[in-house]
């Protein structure tokens, strides 16, 4: 077997070509014909707008860790890659690139522009695939999909037609969020609200035929051209005498009625509001109730249309605002401008101020779908959210639902399968293909909201042009888990749920793992403007993929943001280096002809020494907890447990014990077998976190062809070896004592155990002394009467003491005991706070709660012993 690792860990050597080797050997290829249980993850498709960022790296690392964990646990896994055409985002990028060449999309025309968009897609898709490979994501590339693939387009069209025929999709005039820069409607979630300094402008609306006026305030004077009425509350005694009269709009001198509606709040502003139905959602609803006209005073680009007359027509909306103020000031109908801070909506893509705008759009009726989701989440078949609180976020969205605007005035996307009759535009044909007399019809120019096609992602990707007959659809739906951010629960998660159920009758996924944002080390959100963004590829070039993955995963708690820092990546590298050096030591202590025992031989062996039994027992405990935690997606806690076991239990202690046992012919073979058996299983359990280095080290063990052919550790070793944990604490305490007091190792120290729980010390006194003799040149007696003054050390739940000789400094000892007492009091206070915290008790893993309770009791015992010692001194 004799193989060796390189003297130094080099991530460049370890990671080079490994991913290609996995792909070539089809380790990630799904097999729908396999009898193994199935588990699938469909990658949330990154946009082809650019390269992957650190958030993608975190998201992908989480999914990949789950996939590898499931594969090692005997599942046939499918990790399906794909990319999103990202309608408006990509179109913005392509248009910007064309503008640099002095070309507009309208000059190019639709077909030529789409050619440019596809070129962009192919360029960035290649970059993204390269980034995936660097991250080591376990994709089945034979299943890769793009949201504009022909087979996806066919399913999108089918569902649009199906929903339309069921009355779930309709076309109508509604107020939408309008991006005047991109000249398209955008969804609510694509609107970013920012606090902006602005003004509340007050105007006189004169009462027709009188010298009286009403003070009307607005933040958007440019919409006054389309005012249809003034509105007051019918209960507002200040204005009841004006109801039914007419007021003169100061911007165009048109007379408009004064009406009453309960919508107006008595104590807000002046109590009089102008109603502009085509430019405000609430005004639109008032207009519907009162049967008002809904004229539009702006063009699609945000300029004023013919309603502004010669003076204002063609002006940008904000230029028009300033001119209105200027003119009405002269006419003495402008009262004042009150400074204010208010929330203004900006387009996420173009950063233009969004205009509420009445427009002909296609909509999905959402009431029945919202009810569907609410009923599902109250049933036994509900989709599980991790953390559970995000289930309530989904429900809240569904309880406050509005119809979904699905049409976009773009060219890049799924074109709406609707045709209008040339002779009679009110005649609409919706179908899979154009009507037979296509020459008499014109297809809708608009495309579908990107989220419409993305909402089909969990199942459309599995159909492979075969529809419901696809083996992949039958075997891998529902997906095992969706991993995504909390910011798209409404825009994506909810839509996948209702679209999948409506079309397939199945839920899209069983679990939803929610994560937050990647922030910088100070907690600030990463952004280009702050200059604190991180390119994951730069991190990989400097530290390796495993270091990046480990730092992300071991700081990943469901539902929480993560703070990225270079120091965390460096700490991950140090851990890998520790694992590397430990593995080198193991390999260097094996003979050329070493053959590992079968697992059953380890289980049944009578030749294991006490430290072999101890480390196997400790590993069993850790593996059991790690399994539980990863099943709950608690990668941070599970990773910390593995880190502690590898660094402390295996490397710091077991290998130290093994150095003695490997030099003893009686214990050598069993120790060799144990140390290799453990190394193999450590590598397997670390593989989801560190795929590259674990595969590299595993291959030096000369076992199976790949670590991916191995099985997750599921054995249980239970030996009575708890006393070795006592030995470790004793060795640590005595070593620290020697160092503090400058006592050389060749000086024999005779200790006496006293004051506390001495049951284990008594039962295993001989074994404990063997270890103490070997490792710290010390003896330990029990409850001996010592005549002279002694120095005491607190160890777990008992004390050890030694007679005071010349090397003892009593004042220093008192100081150390006082310091220890303070530390314990702080720990007891912390523990009490945790155990009385309802959130901790309700959300933490039972093992974590039990661990905290045990710590609490131990701290109290230690404090009691120290206090007793201080009292005696």
UniProtKB/Swiss-Prot annotation:
Coiled-coil intervals, chain numbering: 804-873
Residue ranges annotated as motif 'KMSKS' region: 525-529
UniProt enzyme class: ligase
Example of a GO biological process term: valyl-tRNA aminoacylation
Top-level taxon of the source organism: Bacteria
Family matches, as InterPro entries: aa-tRNA-synth_I_CS, aa-tRNA-synth_Ia, Anticodon_Ia_Val, M/V/L/I-tRNA-synth_anticd-bd, Rossmann-like_a/b/a_fold, tRNA-bd_arm, tRNAsynth_Ia_anticodon-bd, Val-tRNA_synth_C_sf
Entry EC number(s): 6.1.1.9
A GO molecular function held by the record: aminoacyl-tRNA deacylase activity
Cellular localisation: Cytoplasm
Oligomeric and partner information: Monomer.
Domain notes: ValRS has two distinct active sites: one for aminoacylation and one for editing. The misactivated threonine is translocated from the active site to the editing site.
Family: Belongs to the class-I aminoacyl-tRNA synthetase family. ValS type 1 subfamily.
PANTHER family recorded: VALINE--TRNA LIGASE, CHLOROPLASTIC_MITOCHONDRIAL 2, VALYL-TRNA SYNTHETASES
Name by which UniProt lists this protein: Valine--tRNA ligase
Lineage: Bacteria, Bacillati, Mycoplasmatota, Mollicutes, Entomoplasmatales
């Amino acid at each position: 077997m004799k193989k060796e690792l390189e003297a130094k860990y080099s991530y460049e050597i370890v990671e080079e070509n490994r991913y290609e080797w996995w792909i070539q050997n089809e380790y990630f290829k799904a097999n729908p014909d396999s009898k193994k249980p199935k588990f699938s993850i469909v990658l949330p498709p990154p946009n082809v707008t650019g390269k992957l960022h650190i958030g993608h790296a975190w998201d992908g690392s989480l999914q990949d860790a789950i996939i590898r964990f499931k594969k090692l646990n005997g599942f046939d896994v499918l990790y399906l890659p794909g990319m999103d055409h990202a309608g408006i985002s990509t179109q913005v990028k392509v248009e910007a690139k064309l503008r640099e060449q002095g070309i507009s999309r309208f000059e190019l025309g639709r077909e030529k522009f789409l050619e440019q968009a596809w070129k962009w897609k192919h360029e960035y898709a290649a970059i993204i695939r390269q980034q995936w490979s660097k991250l080591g994501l376990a994709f089945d590339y034979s299943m890769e999909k793009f949201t504009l693939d022909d087979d996806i387009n066919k399913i999108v069209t089918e569902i649009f037609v199906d929903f339309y025929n069921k009355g779930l999709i309709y076309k109508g005039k509604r107020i939408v969020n309008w991006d005047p820069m991109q000249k398209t409607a955008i969804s609510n979630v694509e609107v970013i609200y920012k606090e902006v300094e602005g003004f509340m402008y007050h105007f006189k609306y004169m009462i027709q035929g009188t010298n009286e006026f009403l003070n009307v305030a607005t933040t958007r004077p440019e919409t006054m051209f389309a005012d249809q009425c003034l509105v007051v509350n019918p209960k507002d005694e200040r204005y009841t005498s004006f109801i039914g009269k007419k007021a003169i709009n100061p911007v165009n001198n048109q007379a408009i009625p004064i009406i009453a509606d309960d919508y107006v709040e008595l104590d807000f502003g002046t109590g009089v509001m102008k109603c502009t139905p085509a430019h405000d959602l609430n005004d639109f609803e008032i207009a519907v109730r009162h049967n008002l006209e809904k004229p539009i005073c702006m063009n699609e680009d945000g300029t004023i249309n013919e309603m502004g007359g010669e003076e204002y027509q063609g002006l940008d909306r904000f230029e028009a605002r300033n001119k209105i103020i200027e003119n009405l000031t002269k006419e003495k109908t402008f009262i004042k401008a009150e400074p204010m801070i208010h929330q203004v909506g900006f387009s996420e893509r173009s950063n233009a101020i969004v205009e509420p705008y009445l427009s002909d759009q296609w909509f999905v009726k959402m009431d029945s779908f919202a009810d569907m989701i609410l009923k599902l989440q109250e049933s036994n078949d509900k989709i599980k959210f991790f953390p559970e609180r995000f289930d309530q976020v989904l429900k809240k969205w569904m309880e406050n639902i509005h119809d979904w605007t699905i049409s976009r005035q773009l060219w890049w996307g799924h074109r709406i399968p609707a045709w209008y009759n040339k002779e009679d535009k009110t005649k609409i044909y919706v179908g899979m293909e154009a009507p037979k007399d296509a020459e008499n019809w014109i297809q809708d120019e608009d495309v579908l909201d990107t989220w419409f096609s993305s909402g089909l992602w969990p199942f459309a990707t599995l159909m492979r042009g075969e529809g419901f007959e696809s083996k992949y659809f039958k075997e891998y739906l529902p997906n095992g888990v969706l991993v995504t951010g909390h910011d798209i629960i409404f825009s994506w998660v909810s839509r996948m749920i209702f679209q999948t159920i409506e079309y397939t009758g199945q839920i899209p996924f069983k679990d939803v793992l929610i994560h937050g944002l990647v922030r910088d080390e100070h907690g600030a959100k990463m952004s280009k403007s702050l200059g604190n963004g991180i390119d994951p590829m730069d991190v990989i070039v400097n530290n390796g993929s495993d270091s990046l993955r480990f730092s992300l995963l071991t700081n990943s708690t469901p539902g929480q943001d993560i703070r990225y820092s270079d120091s965390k990546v460096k700490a991950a590298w140090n851990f890998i280096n520790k694992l590397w050096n430990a593995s080198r030591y193991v390999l260097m202590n094996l003979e050329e002809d070493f053959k590992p025992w079968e697992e059953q031989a380890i289980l049944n062996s009578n030749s294991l020494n006490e430290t072999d039994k101890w480390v196997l027992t400790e590993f069993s405990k850790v593996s059991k907890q790690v399994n539980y935690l990863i099943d709950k997606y608690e990668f941070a806690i599970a990773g910390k447990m593995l880190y502690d076991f590898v660094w402390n239990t295996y490397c710091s202690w077991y290998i130290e014990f093994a150095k003695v046992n490997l030099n003893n012919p009686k214990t050598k073979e069993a120790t060799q077998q144990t140390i290799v058996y453990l190394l193999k299983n450590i590598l397997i359990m670390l593989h989801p976190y560190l795929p590259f280095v674990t595969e590299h080290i595993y291959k030096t063990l000369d076992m199976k062809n790949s670590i991916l052919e191995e099985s997750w550790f599921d054995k249980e070793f239970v030996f009575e070896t708890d006393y070795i944990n006592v030995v470790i604490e004793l060795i640590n305490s005595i070593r620290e004592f020697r160092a503090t007091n400058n006592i050389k190792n060749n000086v024999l120290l005779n200790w006496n155990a006293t004051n506390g729980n001495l049951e284990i010390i008594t039962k295993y006194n001989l074994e404990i002394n063997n270890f103490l003799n070997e490792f710290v040149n010390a003896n330990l007696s029990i409850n001996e009467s010592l005549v002279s003054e002694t120095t005491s050390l607190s160890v777990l739940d008992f004390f050890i003491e030694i007679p005071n000789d010349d090397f003892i400094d009593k004042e220093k000892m008192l100081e150390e005991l006082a310091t220890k007492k303070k530390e314990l009091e702080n720990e007891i206070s912390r523990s009490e706070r945790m155990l009385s915290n309802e959130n901790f008790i309700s959300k933490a893993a039972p093992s974590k709660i039990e661990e905290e309770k045990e710590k609490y009791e131990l701290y109290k015992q230690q404090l009691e012993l120290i206090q007793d010692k201080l009292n005696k001194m």
